[in-house]
Structures are given as C-alpha cells and as structure tokens.
Amino acid sequence: TDQTVDTKTMTVDTYGSVQIPWTGEDIKHVNNGSGFETIYGDQIRQAMRSITNAIELAIWTAAYKGSSRGHGTAGTTPFASSFAELPQLRKILQDNGCPFDGQVSVVMDTTASANLRTLAQLQKANEAGGTELLRQGTMLDLMGLMLKESAQITTHTKGTGTSYQLSAAGSVGDTTINVDTGSGTLLAGDIITVAGTSHKYVANTALSGGVFTIGSPGLRAAEADNDAITIGNNYTPNVAFHRSAIELGIRAPAMPPGGDAAVDMMTV
C-alpha cells in the first residue's frame, strides 16, 4: 500500500570549542610546582565538562520547548511532600501514546531532586526496596520512569502577552492556534490554557502573525471562537520524555580544505 513517511530536518547550528594555549615557558614554570601533566589533565576534564554542559542545555531547551503539555503549578517545586506528580506525568505520556519500555525519563532540576531525596518513603529500605538513594544518593526508577537530574535546568520567562482570544474554533488534535485581540509576546515554551478546559499546552513556536503552534497531539478538547487564552507564569521546566523523542547530531569541526596549522590531532 502507499505510505507517507514523515521526515524532519536536522540542522547543526551550534558550534563549541575550548582553547588550551601553552608555551614552552609556561610548561617550564608549572613544572616547578604541580607539573604540566597534572594541570593539563585537569584542563582537558574541564573542557569536556564545559562542552557537555552546553550540549545538555541545548537538549533541555529543545525538550521543554517541544513538549506537548505541562503539569503542576508554576513557581512551586514538585516533590515537597510526595511523588504524586509522577503518575500524572505518566498519564500525559500514556494519553499521548508514549511506549513504556524502560526508556522513559524524567529530568528535573536540582531543587526538585533535593525534594525527592528527602521523602521518607524513598529513604527507608523496607519501603524503597533498597538503600541506594540513602547511601549513594542514587535516584531509583519510579512508576516506570527513570529519574535524572540536571544543573543546566533554569527558569523559563514567559512572554508579555495578555487578552488574546481564539480567532477561530479549534478541533481536537489541532496544533495550529489562531488568536487575535490581544497584545504582547507569546514565546516558545510558554504554558497556555484555553477558557473552559484545564489542559496546559506548551507553545512550540512564538506567536507570529496571529498564529502559534502547540505540541502534538494538539488540543485535547474542542474550543470555540473567542475563547480566552491565558499565558502561565514563569516556571522551571522539568521534562518527561521517551528516549526516541529527542535526537542529537554531533560531528567534529570541519577541516579547512588546505588543512590547518596543527602538528598533532586526536579524536576522542
């Protein structure tokens, strides 16, 4: 039978490098103390951390701005008294058709993970099923979700938009949202609610020409023309996703056609 296979365009649009310049005199000086090999090794490790952090930040930004829906209260860190948010995240993923095959993760900021680590039921071996969290600080899987943390997660600052309304009725599954009457900005990553429903949609694109998009599978309920649009407050985007939801393309920097001035090169 005829098939239509969706395709996506992957663009390498971010470039990073770390320079570690040394002269012979520099090496001679440090060899009187800690030694060049020790310092240079630390510099290599720090360079790798710097690049890894940049990659982590880029992936997280793409993840939350490309999400479908949100859960929770802006400005309130989850897991203060329980992990009740996790089954709600799982429900959203299940409703979206996400497979639960051991490859679904929740990546949270360090404040949320600190809250999670203080929950008594996760510290008690007889309730948690192990002592890894109490002794090593290792977060265990919960609700079929692998729990991870990242220091690169920061606050999303919402757009300034107010008083927007739908300029046309919306059907279940619509991802393109048309609005009018309002003013101000609506940014990618903003949390959007529509009057009459409790769903919290994530804007995947900024408002432009009266149009913005939300993540698939789109609207969960039919909406009427002139329904009010509300932009949620600033928030910290912890993200839940399947491994296949995010793709990362990395390559070594392109070599000039005539080569460069390097006398030695190593790819790790």
Where are these regions (language model features)?
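N-terminal "assembly arms/tails" that initiate or stabilize quaternary assembly
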Residues: T1-D13
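Short intrinsically disordered coil segments
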Residues: D2-V5, Q121-N126, Y164, M265-V268
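Short beta-strand segments
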Residues: K8, V18, H199-Y201
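Long, contiguous amphipathic alpha-helices that act as assembly "spine/axial" helices in icosahedral shell
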Residues: M10-E85, Q94-A112, G137-L147
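Short linear interaction motifs
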Residues: E85-Q88, T175
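Glycine-rich, charged/polar anion/phosphate-binding loops
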Residues: R90-L93, E132-L134
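Autoprocessing Asn-cyclization modules and mimics
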Residues: N115, A120-A228, G232-N233
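Glycine- and charge-enriched low-complexity intrinsically disordered segments
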Residues: T213-T267
